Amino acid sequence: MMKSQVASLLGLTLAILFFSGAHAAKITFTNNCPNTVWPGTLTGDQKPQLSLTGFELASKASRSVDAPSPWSGRFWGRTRCSTDAAGKFTCETADCGSGQVACNGAGAVPPATLVEITIAANGGQDYYDVSLVDGFNLPMSVAPQGGTGECKPSSCPANVNKVCPAPLQVKAADGSVISCKSACLAFGDSKYCCTPPNNTPETCPPTEYSEIFEKQCPQAYSYAYDDKNSTFTCSGGPDYVITFCP
């Protein structure tokens, strides 16, 4: 192929990418917790996983991964992790069950605090949130870097484990509370899970348990229909910083 043809094809490809709004969002994870966290990533819609699906992040360390556009998925932090004599890697909270540091397309086992991001969903607009719908294991926040529009940070900075009701508590061997179940996970009742026949906002209002999450972290999803102040938007192809223990 002639050099001019190669150059033309390259230019056309770049133009298509530019005008279609393609933008790889840089997602940076920062660990402000006093202990090591093992972030996990999961791409939704049965799309290819990111280049990093799980890794170790020491206290005060940061690491980044690129997410293509469009993209949708979730992020979480595993804690109290170890490798046994047989080489199997497990975590006491938010484990993904892969037996490895990499999650390889497996999601977090609840309870787990989640950050959810959808990149370039409608007309290039991003949606993002912190969710306690699957319970809580550690504080998290997500903040756009750049972009246009509101682009406000979403955060759950409180340690919900400290106020977790007894029926929702998950304890370590030493008796300390290490995560807090959602009422849905703890009881399996449709009034907590917002499943039929309680699968509308009208038939699945907040409960005494979701209101504990709401009080501690008003910017986060406390249960399935907590949309009013929990979904955030940003346009213009921002990058994101996800912080553990913000």
Curated annotation (Swiss-Prot):
Coiled coil: none
Gene3D superfamilies in alphabetical order: Thaumatin (2.60.110.10)
Gene designation: TL1
Pfam families hit by this protein: Thaumatin
Name the record gives this protein: Thaumatin-like protein 1a
UniProt keyword Protease, yes or no: no
Primary residence: secreted
Keywords carried by this UniProt record: Allergen, Disulfide bond, Secreted, Signal
N-terminal signal peptide: 1-24
Cystine crosslinks: 33-245, 81-91, 96-103, 151-234, 156-217, 164-180, 184-193, 194-204
Family, similarity comment: Belongs to the thaumatin family.
Compartmental location: Secreted
Gene Ontology annotations for the cellular component aspect, listed alphabetically: extracellular region
Species the sequence originates in: Malus domestica
Keyword Signal: yes
TM segment ranges: none
